[in-house]
From Swiss-Prot:
Protein name as catalogued: Ureidoglycolate lyase
Alphabetical list of PANTHER family matching this protein: UREIDOGLYCOLATE HYDROLASE, UREIDOGLYCOLATE LYASE
Gene3D superfamilies: Ureidoglycolate hydrolase
Record-stated family: Belongs to the ureidoglycolate lyase family.
Protein's GO biological process: allantoin catabolic process; purine nucleobase metabolic process
Catalytic activity: (S)-ureidoglycolate = urea + glyoxylate
The organism's taxonomic lineage, starting at the top: Eukaryota, Fungi, Dikarya, Ascomycota, Saccharomycotina
Length: 195
């Protein structure tokens, strides 16, 4: 059995697994907050996340996921509070040929909205010794690095659902689905996250 305690998502904590888009974190690091974009009505943050493609597809897809919280996760979560809620991970997946970016829609920067679970790879399988979990705010997006193992989206909070717009390159070859997604399954309780 592997158990990991979820931590707060930051650029540094996630960098081994991909990149994040975190506007408040990016803006807090800027020297010059001049609104130099859109005729002075916006701050432009450049190159906040990397997109990679090793698939045969030359055009990325925008997909939409409407995700629902599991009953035990349908409650208010706050950053930094250890509420000791246990969540079992039953599958990790990877996309061997593309990064995958999840952009949450409709939640605020004050809300813990979802949980991200990631692991590095060893021998074409998830290396559970590198497993980490992160609580994400409603205005933080994640880009899983090329081939990074991750759990499907895990929604937190009292809202009925959370929508994600998702950017990925996919071949959509019905004869070779493993080119787009590979899964590793676990029994209930084998891999647990404490939120």
């Amino acid at each position: 059995m592997v158990t990991v305690v979820a931590e707060t998502l930051t650029k540094e904590s996630f960098e081994e697994y991909g990149t994040i888009i975190s506007p408040d974190e990016e803006i807090s690091r800027m020297q010059n907050l001049e609104k130099g974009a859109n005729q002075g009505t916006a701050i432009k943050l450049l190159q906040v996340s990397q997109v990679e493609n090793k698939s045969t597809s030359k055009v990325p897809n925008w997909n939409l996921f409407r995700c629902f919280p599991q009953p035990h996760l349908n409650r208010v979560f706050t950053q930094g509070s250890n509420q000791a809620i246990s969540h079992s991970i039953k599958v990790l997946e990877k996309h061997p040929c593309s990064t995958q970016t999840f952009v949450p829609m409709g939640r605020t920067s004050a809300e813990v909205a979802y949980l991200v679970v990631v692991a590095k790879e060893i021998g074409n399988k998830p290396d559970l010794s590198t497993l980490r979990a992160f609580t994400c705010l409603g205005n933080q997006a994640v880009t899983y690095g090329l081939g990074t193992w991750h759990a499907p989206m895990i929604v937190l909070g009292k809202e009925e659902h959370l929508d994600f717009s998702v950017l990925i390159y996919e071949s959509l070859d019905p004869d070779r689905p493993e080119k787009d997604c590979v899964e590793e399954h676990y029994s209930d309780g084998d891999v647990c996250i404490i939120i």
